[in-house]
């Protein structure tokens, strides 16, 4: 019996070999983990897990992470392997089914990391525990690192924690965005300051769109962010893949007069920092085109004061005045006459009579445009578009316009046009300096009177 051996099957021998290899690997992993902990404060780009992360769909783990239950987290996450697991969530989302011909609920799996969940919800103590257990600071499970989510959700305490433990301030997401790109709300200002103090690059561009943090802040009207980036060396001349500057982004992001105050403040800072008001993108759309298309009179006047040209055309052949006329119907709760008067005062040519139909139901704006002609042109292009109730409310103006169709205007009006022609694009600035009575100055600048004289 002593010379005999127990008969092992081939599958048993293979299982024993795999188990021996697993034990050897586990010994190497533990040794590497101990060495990593000893050098945690030193930059170590090779400090990655040696084997694939395990996935977790355990509801208990999900509840602890998403609710910020620190006591439960301390029980569930006691080693590096647990701290670096992949957390999977499944949610039903509407997706179009070409085969069935209608929208159906389709399960979609999302992956993220425990540390990312904690910092995205502002659970600083939970995040600290995960980091102390060995959670990778710059892991991009699901496309973003923890620092991206902390900035996107504006949690400065979590941002400070991550940076203190060595998170990279310029870590890039799968979309090529840095954490500074994701400081997109007023509340994220402190996050942006912390990133810059940690060495974040203010001029880094995303991979595909090539937007910089300055583009993002300007587009959202974040005037304090814009000021911060400019103080830290942001370049106002950098362009996106579409050729847009930060000033273009600020003017394009001002969606209507109601949101233009913040964007106007951001644009003012950019102009004072040397931004070119004439810089056009690939479609030859200038900042002034964008401001006029959004109906932002104050923003347009700011650009005009800094040298924007009201006569330049974009790729479609439209001037800023054309863009403003097309925006009248899209933004009814504004005063288009202010924008039209500013464009005319800075040298814009009178619009083609066919374009007057766009502001037929805005009598004050229509009056400004009609007073830019030596005589009132044919009213046929716009008279049919006037709403009956509006005609009744402003009958005095509409009747006066019809009565003056192709008729000689007063000598006073012709003199006004002659003075305006002489002053050219400096009409508004010159009128402010001339010693004129207020009523005469308003008349020179096409002030609204309520009727065509």
From Swiss-Prot:
Annotated metabolic or biological route of this protein: Protein modification; protein ubiquitination
Chain ranges of the SOCS box domain: 397-453
Gene Ontology BP annotations: intracellular signal transduction; protein ubiquitination
Domain notes per entry: The SOCS box domain mediates the interaction with the Elongin BC complex, an adapter module in different E3 ubiquitin-protein ligase complexes.
UniProt cross-references to SMART domains, sorted A to Z: ANK, SOCS_box
Protein name as annotated: Ankyrin repeat and SOCS box protein 16
Organism: Mus musculus (Mouse)
UniProt keywords, alphabetically: ANK repeat, Repeat, Ubl conjugation pathway
Source organism superkingdom: Eukaryota
Residues passing through the membrane, by range: none
Pfam families the UniProt entry points to: Ank, Ank_2, Ank_5, SOCS_box
Keyword Zinc: no
Physiological role: May be a substrate-recognition component of a SCF-like ECS (Elongin-Cullin-SOCS-box protein) E3 ubiquitin-protein ligase complex which mediates the ubiquitination and subsequent proteasomal degradation of target proteins.
Family statement drawn from the similarity comment of this UniProt entry: Belongs to the ankyrin SOCS box (ASB) family.
ANK repeats: from-to residues: 56-85, 110-139, 142-171, 175-204, 209-238, 242-279, 283-312
Gene encoding the protein: Asb16
Coiled-coil residues: none
